[in-house]
């Protein structure tokens, strides 16, 4: 609606989604999903946290630096959506996934050996979409409603 309205007024808006449901991993998903927010977070949160962690030498390992920056970045994304538990848990969930994927990419010989094979891309897409859908479920707030219903019994 906003894109159409702005186009009618002659204002060009940036593309905000680029076929995110074709993503074969979570990094790919976040470069395609909500592009303006993802880019802003990458430039102003992830990069700055990463540089600060490297400069202050909080961790001796570059991989730990990146995983920490992913956690902070995705938590910031959760807080950006709101202060409800579901949004914060959603950000934390994606932070854990992004950090875990970073470790998997860097450390897994299986990944390095198979990442370009078609069967692996299909499997990776399937796993990624399931993880994203779990994230959407968390984002919806439904898990907390279900938990409250169970606790009231």
Model-derived regions: residue spans:
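Membrane-embedded transmembrane alpha-helical bundles that form the catalytic cores
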Residues: 1-153
């Amino acid at each position: 609606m906003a894109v159409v309205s702005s186009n009618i007024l002659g204002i060009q808006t940036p593309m905000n989604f680029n076929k995110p449901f074709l993503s074969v991993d979570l990094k790919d998903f976040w470069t395609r999903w909500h592009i303006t927010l993802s880019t802003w977070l990458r430039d102003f949160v992830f990069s700055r946290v990463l540089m600060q962690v490297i400069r202050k030498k909080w961790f001796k390992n570059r991989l730990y630096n990146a995983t920490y920056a992913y956690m902070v970045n995705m938590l910031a994304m959760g807080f950006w959506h709101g202060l409800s538990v579901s949004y914060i848990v959603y950000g934390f969930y994606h932070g854990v996934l992004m950090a875990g994927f970073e470790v998997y990419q860097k450390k897994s010989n299986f990944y390095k050996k198979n990442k370009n094979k078609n069967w692996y891309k299909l499997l990776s897409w399937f796993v990624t979409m399931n993880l994203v859908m779990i994230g959407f479920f968390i984002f919806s707030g439904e898990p907390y409603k279900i938990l409250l219903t169970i606790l009231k019994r």
